[in-house]
Amino acid sequence: MGRFIFVSFGLLVVFLSLSGAEDDSDCPSDWSSNGRFCYKLFQQKMKWADAERFCTEQRTGAHLVSIESNTEAAFVNQMISENIKKTDYVWIGLTVQNEEQQCKSRWSDRSSVSYENLVKPNSKKCFVLKEYEGSRKWFNVYCGQKYAFMCKFLRPR
């Protein structure tokens, strides 16, 4: 009986270690995982459109990062703060698009804008993350500037 319990416990440990919910193995080795997505920060500086195109060329379904929750924002901010100076901007996938005389924000991956962290909106059309009052917030800036950027894609199953 004791041997059966020992073997059963051993199999349970092996099963749990192989089925980790946040396993990075589904993301390429140089990408980070969070939930169902893979992320990578690129420090080379590009214009917004060039950065978006670069992301789409990295992986199927990849785009500039969309941020859909406070939890995801914290993850993205942590990645950036570990690799980018506080004063540097980082492109995200949000843009303002004119649709039928109405300005509307949209993520480049077409996901809905359900979470916002915008500071001081103005007439510029592209968005960056910038240090503001102790954390990174969204600012809209001129799309032709060159900044670092982060890409994101849905992890393969």
Curated annotation (Swiss-Prot):
Residues 34-152 form the C-type lectin domain. Expressed by the venom gland. The lineage of its organism: Eukaryota, Metazoa, Chordata, Craniata, Vertebrata. PANTHER family: MANNOSE, PHOSPHOLIPASE, LECTIN RECEPTOR RELATED. Belongs to the snaclec family. Keywords: Disulfide bond, Hemostasis impairing toxin, Platelet aggregation activating toxin, Secreted, Signal, Toxin. Residues 1-21 form the signal peptide. This is Snaclec mamushigin subunit alpha. Heterodimer of subunits alpha and beta; disulfide-linked. It comes from Gloydius blomhoffii. It is found in: Secreted. GO terms for molecular function: toxin activity. Disulfide bonds join C27-C38, C55-C151, C126-C143. Binds to platelet GPIbalpha (GP1BA) and enhances platelet aggregation at low-shear stress. At high-shear stress, blocks platelet aggregation in a dose-dependent manner. The keyword Disulfide bond applies. GO terms for cellular component: extracellular region. GO terms for biological process: blood coagulation. It holds the Pfam family Lectin_C.
